[in-house]
């Protein structure tokens, strides 16, 4: 079965990468789908930059690909024959946010959502938190893939 891991991934974190790696072990193909989040401001990275960083960060995973989509997620799953969505959960707050969307997606097309619990070492890690730390010169190594940490640091150095 093919699966999709949707998100804004601005930027992809080691927590995201952990979820994708675990999903890749369970599904024949996993697409990391970079989506626009209407609740978030325009990102640190363009969609194209995010996709490049994700490709570099997942190059070791043969059954993982990267794509983008700007419409209903279930339209993508239908168009590409994908039967599963994979979402990582850090806390009950993530569950409360994701549950209604999972139920609506199932109602619309029958696609199932699989929730994977985040590894405890990444339970507090978010793209937003990593950007905040990096913006003020903090160390984001160990939170982001190495190539991503370098790109984030460079972005913020160029803004000062």
UniProtKB/Swiss-Prot annotation:
* NCBIfam families found in the cross-reference section: coaD_prev_kdtB (TIGR01510), cyt_tran_rel (TIGR00125)
Subunit and partners: Homohexamer.
Q: Where is this site: Transition state stabilizer?
A: 16
Its cellular-component GO annotations read: cytoplasm
Keywords (alphabetical) are: ATP-binding, Coenzyme A biosynthesis, Cytoplasm, Magnesium, Nucleotide-binding, Nucleotidyltransferase, Transferase
**CDD domains per the UniProt record, alphabetical:** PPAT
**Which positions bind ATP?**
8-9, 16, 88-90, 98, 122-128
Q: Supply the EC number(s).
A: 2.7.7.3
Enumerate the InterPro entries for this protein.
Cyt_trans-like (IPR004821), PPAT (IPR001980), Rossmann-like_a/b/a_fold (IPR014729)
List the pathway annotation. Cofactor biosynthesis; coenzyme A biosynthesis; CoA from (R)-pantothenate: step 4/5
User: Which cellular compartments is it found in?
Assistant: Cytoplasm
Keyword field contains Protein biosynthesis: no
Q: What is this protein called?
A: Phosphopantetheine adenylyltransferase
Query: What cofactor(s) does the depicted protein rely on?
Result: Mg(2+)
Which family is it part of? Belongs to the bacterial CoaD family.
Q: What's a GO biological-process term for it?
A: coenzyme A biosynthetic process
**Binding annotation for substrate:** 8, 40, 73, 87
